[in-house]
Amino acid sequence: MLVTRHIPHSLMFALFLSGLSSHAEATNLDGVFDAGWTTAYQSADSITHMHKRLHALGMEQVVLQYAAVEKTHLYYPSQLDFLQNTEYKNNQLFHKSIEASKTAGNKLWLGLYYDGENWYTPPTVPQLDTLAARNLKVLDELYALYGNETAIEGVYIPQEIARYYWDGLRDDATVATLATHFLIPVTQAAQAKGWKVMAAPFYNQNLETPEKLQAFFESLFAAGFKPDVIAVQDGVGASDAGKAHANTATVGNYERVVAKVCSQYGIEFWVDMELFRTDDSHALADKARLSAQLDTARAAGATKVIAYDLAVLGNAGLDSLEKWFARDRSQKIPIKNRRSPSKQHNTEIRYYKLNGARVKASQFKKTTTNFKI
């Protein structure tokens, strides 16, 4: 199904900044996800310039969401048989991003292998075993290529963990099954190489309470899944047919229970903050909502807040961010009072379904996306 949205590029990030005080450095975001849908087609110089901008804004944690998306995208030079028929082989993104991170002083998280075909069913035990085996092969290949790169902080498991897929939909669809047959072997293999592991679980307030979410994470960690970082998606931007997955008024209740369980198991708690609106535009949300999300995440105990995602920001958004941030630093005047009229240029982006994820069709006639499911 096709969905159309218009993004006002020139003022997109000014909306975000206008909700912050003049002490933007103390409350800024700590990083951003990059799914590669747009950066895969950019030059090394362009990516390096972007990383320098991110670093200057304090957004030093950059999560490359995928190494490979089954059948469609490949972002590093793989020799693995099951990745050779990938449609779009933009296999220099990881290399360009690593070099950019070293130049800028950022920290990279390398996404692993993603296959969304059976993930929401959820997968059977054999399917989980296959998913784990392929992730382990990708992990080994990434380590052989980039294991000595000091800019790499760790790896990111791109499969989204949601409680309601593992809550009795089938007899074998249990938390223990998910942990034993997929999460634990992948996590332990990465940690054995000296790389940290991050996951970004998703939840839906329409389907669960904070108590259910807390019990799910307690079961997951008790089963032996011990990542270094849980960056829970706040769900505020995501929606189905206009029905939001999470509400800014109550999202803190969910974040706090996850933070509590993470603390009990020695796992660092981050928040993956969704920047996009819940309406059909999927453009950057207004200043009040973004400020509320950021404040709530910090109050819940998040040691870092990283944004989803780079496609929502774009180069034009970073242009605006640099401009307003520089004014704030030099003149000590709240950013919201420094806005001046400027022209808006709208770019139309279309979306369709691809392999379990909503994806957009770009002017390059290649697939792109700017938000998670």
Regions from the language model: what does each represent?
Residues 40-55, 135-144, 209-221, 285-296:
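Short, acidic/polar
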Residues 109-121, 129, 153-160, 183-213, ...:
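Aromatic-lined carbohydrate-recognition surfaces of secreted/lumenal glycan-active proteins
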Residues 113-117, 138-172, 229, 306:
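Active-site groove signature of glycoside hydrolases
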Residues 153, 227-244, 257, 264-330:
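Substrate-binding cleft of secreted/luminal carbohydrate-active enzymes
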Residues 89-103, 124-154, 217-224, 296-297:
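An active-site-proximal structural segment forming one wall of the substrate-binding cleft
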Residues 47-117, 171-199, 246-253, 257:
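Aromatic-lined substrate-binding rim segments of carbohydrate-active enzymes
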Residues 45-71, 220-231, 297-305:
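Catalytic domains of carbohydrate-active enzymes, especially glycoside hydrolases
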Residues 332-373:
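C-terminal outer-membrane/trafficking sorting elements
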